[in-house]
Amino acid sequence: MTEINGKRLLAELKELGKIGIGTDGRRTRLAASDAEKEGRDYVVSKMKEAGLKIVIDHIGNIFGIWDSEENKSIQPFMVGSHIDTVINAGQYDGCLGVLSGLEVIRTLKEQGIRTKRPIIVGAFTNEEGVRYAPDMMGSLVYAGGLSCKKALATVGTDGTILGDELKRIGYEGTIAPGFVTPSAFIELHVEQGPIMDAEGYNIGAVDNLQGIHWMKIHIDGVANHAGTTPTNMRIDAGLAAAKINVFCREMVEKSGGVATIGTISFKPNAVNVIPSKADFTVDIRNPKKEKLDNDEKYLLDYLKTLEETDHVKITTQPMTNFDPVPFDEDLCKKIEVAAKSRNLKVRRMVSGAGQDAQMMARICPTAMIFVPSVKGISHNPDEIGRA
């Protein structure tokens, strides 16, 4: 039975993981930053060492292609993920899916195994969406869900323009995104949750990726003295925000989804002043589209009620709306069979996080393979994956 060189893969994950660690000890490689350029350069160098042909498209997606005269006209099989990170990140998220694909090709070449199809390893631009929105941008553009022109014009949180930054770091490619449609796409990823580690599973065959709705909410109240304004005479934006947070938790406990108030700020943000303004984000997720849509409707209805009861003014702005994505059943079954043939404990999974695979599922049969996240930790320097 063919096996990859696990030590080599882990060593390369460690090397890539060193890139982007600042003086504060935090690992951060935001999309199209200098640190991410260094990470891109490392991955490209490893692809070239393995004898792969490098293609970079207009949105900066990197592809390492292994083909031959015999199979280059056949529709390729693609694997991949991303190498950009969140702030203060772990070293496995995304990177495992890129470097493991490269390791598979190296192993096949070293053992003299020829494949029916070309194999492509992809590293997609801006999966995390920290510096530029939306997340999963590179794969979304590749799959035709967002125009490349619009994506390249995206203004980042630091005022930079994505297209300018890709050009600056040397990754403004020459090939149109979507230059090839794969026969199938597989993304290997850490679970980013606690289930597999807690239940002792080695492999997750991911058959669904839950839908995601993000929105910004702005609340206008009235600033007033914290000590002299009676409770029943306050128009408190901070209190309204807190009520929305509690409502979201109670809502998803009924629907089986999850909801998160991930960012929040108050104005004037003073210890002795009732907040006149509150700005925050809401992240709602559910693997069932009907339940996801209903949760958003329930929240919007509640906001109207809150305006009346608390005398505040509330406005909303959609950020991201991705429907749940069912993955290819045949691929999921093959993942299960392969795991069992190696005596690995496998279970079906739903991905709670957005991934590049959900975008690639728009254009080809797609599935994901999960490995456990030890203690469920991810987006954290303590992130560890295991088999």
Predicted ranges, named:
Residues 75-88, 220-226, 342, 375-378:
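Glycine/charged-rich beta-loop-alpha catalytic/anionic-binding loops adjacent to active sites
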Residues 85-158:
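A generic, well-ordered mixed alpha/beta core segment in the N-terminal half of proteins
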Residues 126-127, 131-290:
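Midchain, well-structured core segments that form catalytic/ion-binding scaffolds
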Residues 3-89, 108:
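Acidic/His- and Gly-rich active-site-bordering loop/insert found
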Residues 6-22, 80-81, 345-386:
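Zn-dependent metallopeptidase/amidohydrolase metal-coordination segment
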Residues 60-62, 83-85, 119-130, 192, ...:
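Acidic, glycine-rich active-site loops and adjacent beta-strand->loop/helix elements
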Residues 29-31, 262-269, 281-288, 313-332, ...:
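A short beta-alpha structural unit
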Residues 57, 114-118, 173-178, 228, ...:
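Flexible, glycine/charged-enriched surface loops at secondary-structure junctions
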